UniProtKB/Swiss-Prot annotation:
Homodimer. The lineage of its organism: Bacteria, Pseudomonadati, Pseudomonadota, Gammaproteobacteria, Enterobacterales. Its EC number is 2.4.2.4. The gene is deoA. It comes from the Bacteria. GO terms for cellular component: cytosol. Pathway: Pyrimidine metabolism; dTMP biosynthesis via salvage pathway; dTMP from thymine: step 1/2. It is an enzyme of class 2 (transferase). Keywords: Glycosyltransferase, Transferase. This is Thymidine phosphorylase.
Length: 440
């Protein structure tokens, strides 16, 4: 038997906590016997004193085990359970293509996703732009979709890592969100509760990233890879660029439209293709579905070329109560804003930098994201035809097309878009789309 205050005192004094002490505290959070003040105190001591690798693994496992851990054995699946998690960005629509692509190659992807957070878009919000799409199927339906389709993208239920929800809510109001051991445990508790064989992390770097610097992004990626592997889930991470919008669009319906066009081959943004392919390659290699990178890329290209990936996406949409002919008729189902027109720069120049976070907040301001958890979402608004770094813009070449539902919103966000994009006379040095692969 432990006392919560003694566990806090021990960590406050810089001593490592045992696995038993960590489990006691986390179960106390779940069972509401540890107070909000005690959660805040422990979070702050961890923020200042950090945690060793064994402590980080113990914290993650305790949070995972605070609720249901999915078990797929009874389904006798003939392939690995694999997933991807992104730290979030703008125009980061990779999940919608990646899940079907990997499923078409023989993987099973039980993806539990989130809503938009701050300036970053949420996969669930994007999918809810599809009429009827059910992000909360019951457990039996979820398992059946995974068995029959190979991929399902759903929201987190209250039974998965419930201690994390209360812990995170306290961190959010006590300035302890940006602690690497706590971020790591929060992300991985939910992912490991999926019962995965392998995981790939997409950790963003740059002006639209969650972590403000490259070194902090790298630290987070290494922490997640170390803890996840320590917890028995084969995990790698890619550091990918978020110094500009990843896709050609940012918003909900507009990104779903881009995802379908990507899968059918109608249009594939080169940067989006590079990141999506690289993440899929990691999933195929970690899951034992390919011999090497060349083999993985060939398999993935084949399911794009022969239409299997698009077919799997369509089957997932139908299985989750969306339209059965969505892939064929997406334009007749997705909402359209009343006003769509281009925004031009006030002078001619070459785009040298982008405040990607500000562009994400422009989508939120249009109604495409939430300022408060209870805010409704406008699925029709957003940005499309985003200009890239290094593009020369003038009176003919716009910065973006803004989709809004009234002229005032359009005018207001046109100013935000102009202010977020820096023009110069010289073409900027091209930055890599993928900075680094982390395996340990």
């Amino acid at each position: 038997m432990f006392l919560a205050q003694e566990i806090i005192r021990k960590k406050r004094d810089g001593q490592p906590l045992s696995e038993e002490e960590i489990r006691f505290f986390i179960n106390g959070i779940r069972d509401n016997v540890v107070s909000e003040g005690q959660i805040a105190a422990l979070a702050m001591t961890i923020y200042f004193h950090d945690m060793s690798m064994p402590e980080r693994v113990a914290l993650t496992m305790a949070m995972r085990d605070s609720g249901t851990v999915l078990n797929w054995k009874s389904l006798n699946l003939n392939g690995p359970l694999v997933d991807k998690h992104s730290t979030g960005g703008v125009g980061d629509v990779t999940s919608l293509m990646l899940g079907p692509m990997v499923a078409a190659c023989g993987g099973y992807v039980p993806m539990i996703s989130g809503r938009g957070l701050g300036h970053t878009g949420g996969t669930l919000d994007k999918l809810e732009a599809i009429p009827g799409f059910d992000i909360f199927p019951d457990d039996n339906a979820f398992r059946k979709i995974i068995q029959n389709v190979g991929v399902a993208i759903i929201g987190q239920t209250s039974s998965l890592a419930p201690a994390d929800k209360r812990f995170y809510a306290t961190r959010d109001i006590t300035a302890t969100v940006d602690s690497i051991p706590l971020i790591t445990a929060s992300i991985l508790a939910k992912k490991l509760a999926e019962g995965l064989d392998a995981l790939v992390m997409d950790v963003k770097v740059g002006s639209g990233a969650f972590m403000p610097t490259y070194s902090l992004s790298a630290d987070l990626a290494q922490a997640i890879v170390g803890v996840a592997n320590g917890a028995g889930c084969k995990t790698t991470a890619l550091l990918t660029d978020m110094n500009q919008v990843l896709a050609s669009s940012a918003g909900n319906g507009v990104e779903v439209r881009e995802a379908v066009r990507f899968l059918t081959g109608e249009y594939r943004n080169p940067r989006l293709l590079e990141v999506t392919m690289a993440l899929c390659v990691e999933m195929l290699l970690s899951g034992g579905l390919a011999h090497d990178e060349a083999d993985a890329r060939a398999k993935l290209q084949a399911v794009l070329d022969n239409g299997k990936a698009a077919e799997v996406f369509g089957r997932m949409v139908a299985a989750q109560k969306g339209p059965a002919d969505f892939v064929e008729r997406y334009d007749s189902y997705l909402p359209v804003a009343t006003l769509s027109k281009p925004v031009f720069a006030e002078q001619t120049g070459i785009i040298t930098a982008m405040d990607t976070r500000a562009l994400g907040m422009a989508v939120v301001a249009l109604g495409g994201g939430r300022r408060r958890a209870t805010d409704p979402i406008d699925y029709s608004v957003g940005l499309t035809e985003m200009a890239r770094l290094g593009t020369r813009v003038d009176g003919q070449q716009p910065l973006a097309v803004i989709h809004a539902n009234n002229e005032d919103d359009w005018q207001q966000e046109a100013e935000v878009v102009r202010a977020a994009i820096t023009l110069g006379n010289n073409t900027p040095e091209e930055t890599p789309v993928i900075y680094r692969r982390i395996t340990e």
